[in-house]
C-alpha cells in the first residue's frame, strides 16, 4: 500500500490540481487506457504498480473488500500519511539545498511551489482516508444486501482518479525536464558569465602588452607577458572551479537518483510482503471451504448409496 502513497507524493509535488472534473465520463474498462502511459523511471513504474493494485482490489469479492476496509487498514493509512509527509518534508529540504547556487528569486519561487504542493498533498491524503472510511461505513450498512451500486460508484471514482493520475504524471514529466534543463542551463550560464568577465580583461592585457612591447624595452615586454600569463592562469583556475562545481552538482544528482532507486526497491519489497500477507489470510479459508465441500459431497454419495437397501425393510 506504500506504492499508493508514493505515487500520490510524486504527482502532487509537481503542483498538479487536485480537483476532479464534475462532468460525466464514458464507461471505460479498467486497464484499457493504461498502455499509453509508459516509462522507465522508478517513479513511473511505481505509478503503474499503483494502478494495477487498485484494479486488483476492485476485482475482489465482497468479503475480501470488507477485510481490506477494516479498521486496521484505516490505521495503516494514517501511519502511511505521517510517513509520507516526513518524506515530503525531507525531499523538499534536500531540493532547496540543491537549488542553493540558483538566483534567490528562482529559489523562493520553487520553495513556494513545493510548500503549496505539500499542503495539497496533506489535504488530498486526508480526503482519500475519509473516502475509504465512508465506503467502509456504507458496506457495513448494506451487509446482506447487494453492493452493485457501491461497486459502480467505486469504479467511477477509480476512472476519474486514473484520468487525473495520467494528466498529473505527464505534467510531472514536463516539470522534471524543465527543472533539470534549468539546473544545467544555470551551471553553463555561470561558466559563460566568468568567461565574459575575464574576456575583456584578457583582451585588455594583450593590447597593453602589445603597446608596452612597442614603446618600451624588453624588460617591460617580459613584465607584460608575466602579467598576461597571470591573468590567463587566473582565468583557467576560475574555469576549473566552475567545472568542479558542475561536476559536484552532477554527483549530487546521481546520489539523489540512487536514493530514489533504493527507496523504490524497498517499497516494492514491502508491497510484495503485503501481497503475501493477504494471500496467507485467504488461503486457509479457501482450503477449509474445499474440505467442507468434499465432506458434503461424500455424505450425499453415502446417503444415495444406502437409500435402496432401506426401502425393502420398511415394506416387510
Curated annotation (Swiss-Prot):
APOE exists as multiple glycosylated and sialylated glycoforms within cells and in plasma. The extent of glycosylation and sialylation are tissue and context specific. Gene3D superfamilies: Apolipoprotein, Apolipoprotein A-I. Residues 79-254 are annotated as: 8 X 22 AA approximate tandem repeats. Transmembrane segments: none annotated. Keywords: Chylomicron, Endosome, Extracellular matrix, Glycoprotein, HDL, Heparin-binding, Lipid transport, Lipid-binding, Oxidation, Phosphoprotein, Repeat, Secreted, Signal, Transport, VLDL. It is found in: Secreted; Secreted, Extracellular space; Secreted, Extracellular space, Extracellular matrix; Extracellular vesicle. This is Apolipoprotein E. One of its GO terms (biological process) is chylomicron remnant clearance. The modification Methionine sulfoxide is found at residue 142. Homotetramer. May interact with ABCA1; functionally associated with ABCA1 in the biogenesis of HDLs. May interact with APP/A4 amyloid-beta peptide; the interaction is extremely stable in vitro but its physiological significance is unclear. May interact with MAPT. May interact with MAP2. In the cerebrospinal fluid, interacts with secreted SORL1. Interacts with PMEL; this allows the loading of PMEL luminal fragment on ILVs to induce fibril nucleation. Residues 277-289 are annotated as: Specificity for association with VLDL. Heparin binds at residues 161-164, 228-235. Sequence repeats lie at residues 79-100, 101-122, 123-144, 145-166, 167-188, 189-210, 211-232, 233-254. InterPro entries: ApoA_E, Apolipoprotein_A1/A4/E. Belongs to the apolipoprotein A1/A4/E family. Residues 157-167 are annotated as: LDL and other lipoprotein receptors binding.
Amino acid at each position: 500500500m506504500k506504492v499508493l502513497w508514493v505515487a500520490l507524493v510524486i504527482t502532487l509535488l509537481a503542483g498538479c490540481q487536485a480537483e476532479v472534473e464534475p462532468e460525466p465520463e464514458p464507461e471505460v474498462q479498467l486497464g484499457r487506457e493504461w498502455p499509453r502511459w509508459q516509462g522507465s523511471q522508478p517513479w513511473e513504474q511505481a505509478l503503474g504498480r499503483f494502478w494495477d493494485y487498485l484494479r486488483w482490489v476492485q476485482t475482489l469479492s465482497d468479503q475480501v473488500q470488507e477485510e481490506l476496509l477494516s479498521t486496521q487498514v484505516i490505521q495503516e493509512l494514517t501511519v502511511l500519511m505521517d510517513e509520507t509527509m516526513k518524506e515530503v518534508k525531507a525531499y523538499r529540504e534536500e531540493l532547496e539545498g540543491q537549488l542553493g547556487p540558483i538566483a534567490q528569486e528562482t529559489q523562493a519561487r520553487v520553495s513556494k511551489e513545493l510548500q503549496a504542493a505539500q499542503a495539497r498533498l496533506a489535504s488530498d491524503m486526508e480526503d482519500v482516508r475519509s473516502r475509504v472510511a465512508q465506503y467502509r461505513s456504507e458496506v457495513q450498512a448494506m451487509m446482506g444486501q447487494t453492493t452493485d451500486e457501491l461497486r459502480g460508484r467505486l469504479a467511477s471514482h477509480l476512472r476519474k482518479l486514473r484520468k487525473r493520475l495520467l494528466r498529473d504524471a505527464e505534467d510531472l514529466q514536463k516539470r522534471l525536464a524543465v527543472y533539470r534543463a534549468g539546473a544545467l542551463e544555470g551551471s553553463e550560464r555561470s561558466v559563460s558569465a566568468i568567461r565574459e568577465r575575464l574576456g575583456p580583461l584578457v583582451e585588455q592585457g594583450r593590447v597593453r602588452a602589445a603597446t608596452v612591447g612597442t614603446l618600451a624595452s624588453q624588460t617591460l615586454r617580459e613584465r607584460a607577458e608575466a602579467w598576461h600569463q597571470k591573468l590567463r592562469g587566473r582565468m583557467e583556475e576560475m574555469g576549473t572551479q566552475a567545472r568542479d562545481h558542475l561536476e559536484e552538482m552532477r554527483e549530487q544528482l546521481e546520489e539523489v537518483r540512487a536514493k530514489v532507486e533504493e527507496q523504490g526497491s524497498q517499497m516494492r519489497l514491502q508491497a510484495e510482503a503485503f501481497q503475501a500477507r493477504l494471500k496467507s489470510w485467504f488461503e486457509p479459508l479457501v482450503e477449509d471451504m474445499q474440505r467442507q465441500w468434499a465432506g458434503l459431497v461424500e455424505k450425499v454419495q453415502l446417503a444415495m448409496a444406502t437409500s435402496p437397501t432401506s426401502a425393502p425393510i420398511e415394506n416387510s
